[in-house]
């Protein structure tokens, strides 16, 4: 489920939350996202940041969105389901092949989830590389159904090699 494409005004709202610390955008965006979800998964999780990036930024925008969305939908949120065990360069501007390589072994599942239907929350999905890695971890432990809830999606970057 996605609110829309990465363009004005959604792109501005996401940018303000992520880079300008305008935290009031999180509940607003979560409410917009909730309107797109007819049958929510019983458990939400979010895309984790490496501890260094979280320390530098001071917060994880996907975590903020997931917390707000869980409140709006009145469902469980597990903020510790995943961890990012390896710091990776920013994904922005990388080709699909570079993103896949960049994320190799970057994530770990901290514990088996307590549900068979889970939704992963992220702010922006571009190629889906990050989401794909997290889905693989969930599928490996027997999760039956995975939904993706994001604010924006972007067109796949042009890559003549990938």
Spans of features found by a protein language model:
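Basic, glycine-rich
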Residues: 124
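Conserved PRPP/pyrophosphate-binding segment of the phosphoribosyltransferase/PRPP-pathway fold
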Residues: 1-119, 127-162
């Amino acid at each position: 489920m996605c609110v829309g494409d990465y363009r004005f005004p959604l792109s501005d709202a996401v940018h303000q939350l992520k880079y300008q610390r305008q935290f009031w955008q999180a509940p607003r965006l979560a409410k917009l996202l909730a309107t797109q979800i007819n049958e929510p998964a019983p458990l939400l999780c979010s895309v984790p940041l490496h501890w260094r990036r979280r320390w530098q930024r001071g917060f994880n925008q996907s975590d903020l969105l997931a917390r707000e969305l869980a409140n709006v939908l009145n469902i469980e949120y597990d903020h510790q389901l995943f961890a990012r065990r390896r710091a990776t360069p920013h994904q922005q501007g990388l080709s699909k092949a570079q993103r896949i390589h960049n994320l190799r072994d970057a994530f770990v599942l901290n514990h088996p989830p307590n549900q068979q239907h889970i939704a992963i929350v992220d702010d922006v999905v571009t190629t889906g590389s990050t989401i794909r890695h997290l889905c693989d971890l969930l599928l490996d432990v027997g999760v039956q159904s995975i939904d993706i809830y994001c604010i924006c999606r972007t067109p796949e970057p042009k890559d003549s090699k990938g």
